[in-house]
Every structure is written in C-alpha cells, then in structure tokens.
Amino acid sequence: MNGKIALEEHFATEETLMDSAGFVPDKDWPELRSRLLDIQDRRVRLMDEHGIETMILSLNAPAVQAIADSTRANETARRANDFLAEQVAKQPTRFRGFAALPMQDPELAARELERCVKELGFVGALVNGFSQDNRSAVPLYYDMAQYWPFWETVQALDVPFYLHPRNPLPSDARIYDGHAWLLGPTWAFGQETAVHALRLMGSGLFDKYPALKIILGHMGEGLPYSMWRIDHRNAWIKTTPKYPAKRKIVDYFNENFYLTTSGNFRTQTLIDAILEIGADRILFSTDWPFENIDHAADWFENTSISEADRKKIGWGNAQNLFKLNR
C-alpha cells in the first residue's frame, strides 16, 4: 500500500540526543543514535521501500519537557523547531513538522506554537508528557488552570496536539521500584499518558474548547478498553459528578481524541480500538526509530480490516486531520 502518512516519527538534535540513550542496551545505542540523527538518507529510503509518502516529524523525548528552566526550555524548543523547518524544506512533499513546545510557561508555549504554525508551516505540536519547572513543586499537567489560555490558542490555530509519553518522575514512580523493566514503553509510558489524558477529559477543558483535537499514540495508551468501566464506576453512586466536566468521559474520548498505531502492531488491539472510537479516528504511525518501519508497514498492510478502513487509517484520516494536499 503506497501513500501512507505516518505521524509519530522522531528525530533528535545533538542537544537532545542523549535523552534517548537509556531506552536501549549500550550495545544498541550506536544504531539508535544513527537512526535519530538521520532524516534525509536512510529514513527516506525506508519510506520508499515501505510505501510511506509522508512523515510528520517530532523531537525525541522527554527533551524540552525535562528542562526545568523555562527560558532554556524555550530556547531549546526554538532551536529544534528551526532545525526541523530546515529539514522539512529540503523535501516538503515527504516531511511535515510537529512543534516542540516549552510548556513550562504556557504563554511562551502559545507563542512558539503560533510561530511554528504561521511562520514555519508546521501542522501541529507534539509534547512529551508533563513538564518540569523549577518554580513548581509538582509536575505540570496541562489540565491545570494556567494552561487554559494556551488551549485557546491551540483551538484558534485549529491544529492537533499530540500528547506523547514520558516516564514518571522518580518521586512518583515508587510502584516500579525493583521492576525497572516496567518503565518506558513496556508499561509506564502508557499509564502516565493515559492518566494525563483522563485529566484533560475530566477537567472541563473540552466543554470550553470543544474543537480541540488531541492525538494519543500506541493505539490509545490502553484507554479504548477502559472507557465503559471509567464511566460506569463514576456513575455507580448517584451524587454530584466527581469531576468538573459536564459529560461522560467517553463522549470526550470519542469527539476530541485521535489514536495512532505507533508501536502497537497487533490486529486484535486495532479492531478493539476501531470498535470503541471508530476507524475515522485512527491513523497509521510507526514510532521510528524506536520501532522498525518494515514491522509497522508489513503488519498494517496485512492486518484483518476492510480495505476502506485500511485507506482511512493509512492516509485518508491524516490527510483530513492535517489538511494535507495530495
């Protein structure tokens, strides 16, 4: 299947490269390093070999989100975004860009997103989970009141916001003590991101800004399979709603969220996601360079779904969501 659009596809700059070093054994680091730093060569050859027309590129994790000084976070984000814009300009039919944002300061983040969309031609933002800020005693999650003006900007710009995982801080990760194998993409990434997404849904954010579009990777970070139970238990005792939002959690999930297949190449999982959120809200992705492009493409092209859904997920939904001309 040619013409696929992939949208959780990472790169690194020399400045952010080492943030990815801990995700593979030392012996595999040279390979991952090479993959992260390459954009124009091997990546494009693999795209050609496996029918990927366009990649939407994003900075590796946690990068900007782990820089506790907001001024330095902003400077790092701007350098990464300028570098990405230069790379996209070399092959604008093959690459598009997601903005990295200094979410430590909502006003700076809104300004940088506006710059990236209006001046650099980016199609949205990808943010690596919560942000650290040396002015705050707690991690910053984006349902907090100080972020609502930022979300107003996102809605006004009419671009998607990809909420990408990161590990919890050590102070919040005691449950993983002695079980480091559960950290990262094995489990902790999904759990951390799912809770963050639920915070957004329950906060009332989507009542105030109903046109927001949030993307979750890895087939929804486990959320599609929990929607019924979340709403069922919240409604079990007939009292005032336990969260500020006006509607059921599943309503926001189905109306404000999109999912990608990044790093979750399992047919049963895809079918379950289709049954929960619908094929119109699922998009193909690979999670390169942390997953292999051939694994993602070979699975997707042979998975047991209808050809109509394969076209939607493979490229049609992304074309519509990002307003891409083909």
From Swiss-Prot:
UniProt cofactor(s): Mn(2+)
Record-level Gene Ontology MF annotations: carboxy-lyase activity; hydrolase activity; metal ion binding
Stored Pfam families: Amidohydro_2
Residues given in the record as Mn(2+) binding sites: 8, 10, 164, 287
GO cellular component, one term: cytosol
Cofactor remark: Binds 1 Mn(2+) ion per subunit.
EC nos: 4.1.1.103
Matching InterPro entries: ACMSD, Amidohydro-rel, Metal_Hydrolase
Statement: the UniProt record of this protein carries the keyword rRNA-binding: no
Alphabetic keyword roster: Decarboxylase, Lyase, Manganese, Metal-binding
Reaction equation(s) it catalyzes: 2,6-dihydroxybenzoate + H(+) = resorcinol + CO2; 2,3-dihydroxybenzoate + H(+) = catechol + CO2
Pathway(s) of this molecule: Aromatic compound metabolism
Record function comment: Involved in the gamma-resorcylate (2,6-dihydroxybenzoate) catabolism. Catalyzes the reversible decarboxylation of gamma-resorcylate to resorcinol. Also catalyzes the decarboxylation of 2,3-dihydroxybenzoate to catechol, 2,4,6-trihydroxybenzoate to benzene-1,3,5-triol, and 2,6-dihydroxy-4-methylbenzoate to 5-methylbenzene-1,3-diol.
Known partners and oligomeric status: Homotetramer.
Record's protein name: Gamma-resorcylate decarboxylase
Taxonomic source organism: Polaromonas sp. (strain JS666 / ATCC BAA-500)
Taxonomic placement: Bacteria, Pseudomonadati, Pseudomonadota, Betaproteobacteria, Burkholderiales
